[in-house]
Amino acid sequence: MRRLALSAAAAAALLASLPAAAEEVGRVGVDWVGNDIVVEAISDPKVEGVTCHVSYFDRSVIDRLQKGNWFEDPSNTAIACNQTGPISVGDIDLSADGEEVFKQGVSLIWKKQVVTRIYDRKHETLVYLAHTRQVQEGSAKMSMSTVPLYGQEVAWKNGKP
């Protein structure tokens, strides 16, 4: 029985440390070959009450065959984050590098779409940066959204920094 409890606790800790999963909330067709703009909702796993919506271009098989570059989608990503409930901040990374909140592949192997959270302590604001990461060549395409905490009733699980 004790092993089961320890295993359950370890699994819960592992799941809490993983980046969030996205939930598709919309898909808009943009042309006759099947290219779409996908809209997904992402709840911050360490900040309850904040939801980000990201959108990105999803290439169709026909487009990939016509234009080559079969294995990746464009780097363009848009993001909007808002308070969607009472905010409770868990054990977040307070460094200037921030913390990865979400990651998904947008190519066969190397290219990742990433959402990084940065806490702006001076302005009491959560900053969410959407960008792509590649092994060899980064992209300058990015989008940013902020959730101000100033004047809000925010519960800090480890005390306000």
Label each PLM-derived region with a short phrase.
Residues 1-8:
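Bacterial N-terminal signal peptides that target proteins for export
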